[in-house]
From Swiss-Prot:
Minor inner capsid component. Displays NTPase and RNA 5'-triphosphatase (RTPase) activities. May function as a cofactor of polymerase VP2. Associates with microtubules and plays a role in the formation, structural organization and morphology of viral inclusions, where the assembly of cores and the replication of viral RNA occur. GO terms for cellular component: host cell cytoplasm; host cytoskeleton; viral inner capsid. The gene is S6. This is Microtubule-associated protein VP6. Keywords: Capsid protein, Host cytoplasm, Host cytoskeleton, Inner capsid protein, Virion. It is found in: Virion; Host cytoplasm, Host cytoskeleton. It comes from Cryphonectria parasitica mycoreovirus 1 (strain 9B21) (CpMYRV-1). It comes from the Viruses. The keyword Membrane does not apply.
Length: 649
């Protein structure tokens, strides 16, 4: 059976049949890049979760209906080289775990959808116009087959969903396209056998016309000029109150200077800004659903049509030029090998974006050259990197020797307002109870030390595990809290968590090799730990733990870093957690935000060796990630850190 040569949709490799059927109803992109853009545009509105190849995927349609689906296996066909590939296939354990060789697939296997694993075969049977439910790819060598798994699915989905701050568009533009993308572009069989055309108008209609698009201050100026020409369009402008253009003009300044009676909605925080965007999108989609045509953001009122505009804040972008890097002596063999790989692949020049705050701008302008010995915190305050190699390099800086200098300071606007959710206004750290969600080695420690300088006590994310260890020893929750939080800051942080201790025990007793790599959620050691975590999560409810901590802090205060002592009240209290289950177990919370770094937290854990068993730490981090859903405002650590530094002076 000859494989079709239609241009394919690159994202369909990652989608199960229900989602694939949804995409096929839309116009077909003519190029690979348009397919990737569409995939990214869709996933920016959805949450997609991948744990391996038989993962549960959370899918949300325009109607916000969520269902669990299973990712389908793929079929890899090699009509002329099957025997040659098979001769070396069993020399590759990674492929054995992922692919099952079946030389002759039967029609019944495809018809009943009986495949439970990716398959390598010499050819496909005739289907007699019946539907093949699996995606099909042609491979000619063992390297072609390996390349289909060389671009980690989980890493790609991290990028697409914003769990890492690298944009898919930048990734594809600046790195080579994986071979499986090229295969997919050329050889995919549509499940309905229909080829549809695509025009720019179609793409705009499906992915732009249905929602209000955030604009930059510069674009707002142009829109105002256009409006003054036709004299008919009114604008409702939404903007965070401190958003400025690259010429340092605020939204209010621009509107006043235009002389037009536009409505300006100034919001106090970027989280409010993001919620207003979501509300407008829902209104547009609802209108589209009822009127059977693409929704417009024009709202009818007595003054005529009014268009909603969302104005994006700018970022400062700089090119960073690196000197040749060397590795600091005295590190272990695993760390040295990883650092050598990072240094060999690291770019000599990369671009980084910072939150557009005056102190960052002055630092960039006044401090042109700096050394890796001056502390890595300022590097981590960026909000966007354009390449994964630069991300690895920034993560490794504390273990490297070298210098940098800045070039080409400019302003830029990123199209994804996801990066600004939560915003620059962190005054809520000064009042009420705030919960910060962050992965391990995700910048919590740096943020906590800055918050402590405001006089606000911070409860560390590992304190819950430390309390459980004391409860295991026979103490009540209240007695355990009293014992732990009566210690000074350094003593408290040096106390071992029950979770770290138990994961290390599981790893030491397991017969599996202790690999220092990114773990899979299906790892049996993670499954074993999940039983332990669930048991103690029920025995020591997080709500009871927080209530006891609040009571203790109210009566006694709390010791912080560098001799800081909080006052004896918890009107302002920050609680750091690892996961959504912990963050949602108690009431009386003023704000819940999630922070994420631009560095690679897994590489960071390998290099810093905070615990005695790095393998156990990686597994524990992977478990926290596997039970966490991102339902909160996403806020770059760089935004929080730069704003807090401005507040504390």
């Amino acid at each position: 059976m000859e494989l079709p040569h239609d241009k394919a949709w690159a994202y369909l490799l990652l989608t199960p049949p229900p989602l694939r059927d949804y995409f096929i109803q839309l116009p077909k992109p003519a190029t690979l890049q348009l397919a990737l853009n569409r995939f990214a545009a869709y996933l920016e509105k959805q949450y997609l979760r991948d744990s391996l190849y038989m993962e549960k995927i959370v899918i949300g349609t325009h109607y916000n209906v969520r269902k669990n689906r299973v990712l389908q296996p793929r079929i890899f066909v090699s009509p002329s080289n099957y025997t040659r590939i098979l001769s070396t296939f069993y020399d590759h354990p990674d492929l054995i775990a992922e692919v099952l060789p079946i030389q002759h697939l039967s029609k019944s296997q495809l018809k009943r959808g009986g495949l439970t694993k990716n398959v390598l075969t010499s050819g496909l049977p005739e289907m007699n116009n019946e539907q093949n439910p699996y995606a099909v790819f042609e491979v000619n060598t063992i390297d072609d087959l390996k390349a289909c798994f060389a671009f980690p699915t989980e890493w790609l989905i991290d990028i697409l969903t914003g769990r890492n701050s690298i944009s898919l568009h930048y990734t594809i533009d600046r790195t080579s396209i994986p071979k499986w993308y090229a295969h997919l572009e050329a050889r995919f069989q549509y499940s309905d056998g229909v080829t549809k055309s695509l025009t720019d108008a179609d793409l705009r209609q499906h992915y732009i016309g249905v929602q209000p698009i955030p604009v930059t201050c510069e674009e707002l100026l142009q829109k105002m000029n256009d409006a003054s020409i036709n004299g008919n369009t009114m604008y409702r402008v939404h903007g965070y109150e401190s958003i400025v253009s690259s010429r340092m003009e605020t939204v209010n300044d621009l509107v006043k200077a235009s002389g037009k009676p536009y409505d300006v909605v100034n919001v106090q925080t970027m989280s409010s800004y993001s919620r207003s965007i979501s509300k407008a999108i829902n209104q547009a989609v609802t209108k589209d659903r009822h009127n059977k045509h693409v929704g417009s953001t024009k709202l009818k009122n007595s003054q005529g049509p009014r268009t909603t505009i969302f104005v994006m804040p700018p970022y400062i972008t700089v090119d960073v030029v690196c000197s040749p890097m060397t590795i600091k002596p005295g590190l272990g063999p695993i760390q040295t090998k990883l650092l050598k790989s990072i240094v060999d692949q690291s770019p000599r020049r990369f671009r980084i974006a910072y939150a557009a705050k005056p102190q960052i701008e002055q630092d960039v302008l006044n401090k042109r050259i700096f050394s890796t010995d001056e502390g890595p915190e300022s590097y981590f305050q960026g909000v966007e990197l354009l390449t994964p190699e630069a991300k690895s390099l920034l993560t490794a800086l504390p273990q490297l020797v070298g210098t940098f200098h800045y070039e080409k300071l400019s302003y830029a606007h990123f199209p994804s307002y996801r990066l600004t959710a939560g915003g620059y206004n962190v005054d809520y750290f000064k009042r009420g109870v705030t919960v910060i969600v962050a992965r391990k080695h995700g910048g919590k420690g740096m943020v906590a030390k800055l918050i402590w300088k405001l006089g606000t006590p911070v409860i560390d994310s590992d304190d819950y595990g430390r309390i459980i260890k004391l409860v295991e020893a026979g103490l009540t929750i209240d007695d355990a809290v009293t014992q732990l939080f009566s210690m000074d800051y350094d003593q408290r942080n040096s106390t071992v968590s029950a979770f770290d201790e138990h994961m290390e025990m599981i790893v030491s007793q397991s017969k599996m090799k202790q690999e220092i790599t990114y773990p899979r959620a299906s790892d049996p050691r993670i499954t074993a730990f999940a039983d332990y975590y669930s048991k103690w999560f029920l025995k020591v409810p997080y709500s009871d733990y927080v209530a006891s901590v609040k009571n203790f802090v109210t009566k006694n205060g709390l010791s912080g870093p560098n001799g800081i002592q909080s006052t004896n009240h918890y009107d302002t209290l920050v609680i750091q957690v690892h996961t959504l289950p912990e963050a949602t177990q108690f009431l009386g919370v003023n704000n819940i935000i999630e922070v994420y770094p631009i560095i690679d937290s897994y590489i960071g854990m390998i290099l810093r060796q905070q615990t005695s068993n790095t393998c156990a730490e990686l597994l524990l981090a992977r478990y926290y990630e596997s039970i966490h859903l991102r339902n909160f405002d996403m806020l770059p650590v760089g935004v929080v850190a730069s704003t807090l530094e401005a507040l504390v002076g």
